[in-house]
Amino acid sequence: MKPGGPIGVVGAGSWGTTLAQVIADKGFEVDLWVFEPELCKTIRETRQNDLYLPGVVLSGRINAHNDLDRVVKNHDLLIMVVPSHVYRNVATAMIPFLKPDAVVVNATKGIENDTLLTMSGIWREVLPPGLQVRVLCLSGPSFAREVARKVPTAVTLAGDELQTAKAVQHVISTGYFRIYTSLDKIGVEIAGASKNVIALAAGVSDGMSFGYNSRAALITRGLAEITRLGVKMGSNPLTFLGLAGIGDLLLTCTGDLSRNRTVGIQLGQGRRIKDILAEMRMVAEGVKTAKSIHFLARRIGVEMPICEQVYRVIYEDKDPRVVVRELMERDLKHELELGH
């Protein structure tokens, strides 16, 4: 794939801005959609996104726009990075401007609350029959601030057919941002969304000063839960041993830059979720995803005890100390049975 013009990036949060910078470093012109008019003006005038990626000087190849059509119309390749709770609205607004054969790379990690659809599932629902838009998914262990500093990073790009995935892989990969391809789109999306819920649990554990043993147990058993869910939905179990699975899970559960882990730490210290979120500018996707995972697991009959308890802490104000006791006193199991 050789895009005939600029590449569009829809969303100028920390990750969207960083991906725009990566693509600009590859030599492409980038049209970046910025929702906030004042931020758009700031990026144009100062070459910095002081709201979401402060301290990073942006490439002169990045052109900030407040009009969505300027970023979508006549673009062969689009990267979409908006919060999951507004994803459907933005995708729907893009449709009148999409090229019939455009490629959209989803870089949002989440599951829609009302429909329990992944982001590519939303595209399947909103795209009219006449458009042959190909939707891929980019996920993996990638803190935006580290990628913006050109720290070596590896991620997974999943699509429905290998030719398109490889084409996009060659367009976006750089000397510091390495992309591997996959054909397991649902597995990559489920892993990317679910790991944020486990990161909340790991943060609660850290906030309660439980130590490394507890964190290791949560990550390992959390991976088992994510794998059960993914396999039940048709994923390849090996996906969860890769970058989009255990790689992203490890990073989000242990890294100090993890917003979800940070929220979990404060929950573990006894703070209320509404007070924590009131102080945050950026989105911790795990908070909304905990609700989606709770209902999705119940609907398809998958046991996810850690995710279930995270849901109860956030949405039912359950005491984390009670959660720990209940998790540790569950019926004893054989470790490697997929149903447990």
From Swiss-Prot:
Keywords: Cytoplasm, Lipid biosynthesis, Lipid metabolism, NAD, NADP, Nucleotide-binding, Oxidoreductase, Phospholipid biosynthesis, Phospholipid metabolism. The active site is at K195. PROSITE patterns: NAD_G3PDH (PS00957). GO terms for molecular function: glycerol-3-phosphate dehydrogenase [NAD(P)+] activity; NAD binding. It catalyses: sn-glycerol 3-phosphate + NAD(+) = dihydroxyacetone phosphate + NADH + H(+); sn-glycerol 3-phosphate + NADP(+) = dihydroxyacetone phosphate + NADPH + H(+). Sn-glycerol 3-phosphate binds at K109, G140, S142, K195, D248, S258, R259, N260. InterPro entries: 6-PGluconate_DH-like_C_sf (IPR008927), 6PGD_dom2 (IPR013328), G3P_DH_NAD-dep (IPR006168), G3P_DH_NAD-dep_C (IPR006109), G3P_DH_NAD-dep_N (IPR011128), NAD(P)-bd_dom_sf (IPR036291). Pathway: Membrane lipid metabolism; glycerophospholipid metabolism. The keyword Transport does not apply. NADPH binds at S14, W15, K109, A144, R259, V283, E285. GO terms for biological process: carbohydrate metabolic process; glycerol-3-phosphate biosynthetic process; glycerol-3-phosphate catabolic process; glycerophospholipid metabolic process; phospholipid biosynthetic process. It holds the Pfam family NAD_Gly3P_dh_C. It is found in: Cytoplasm. PANTHER family: GLYCEROL-3-PHOSPHATE DEHYDROGENASE, GLYCEROL-3-PHOSPHATE DEHYDROGENASE [NAD(+)] 2, CHLOROPLASTIC. Belongs to the NAD-dependent glycerol-3-phosphate dehydrogenase family. Catalyzes the reduction of the glycolytic intermediate dihydroxyacetone phosphate (DHAP) to sn-glycerol 3-phosphate (G3P), the key precursor for phospholipid synthesis. This is Glycerol-3-phosphate dehydrogenase [NAD(P)+]. It comes from Syntrophobacter fumaroxidans (strain DSM 10017 / MPOB).
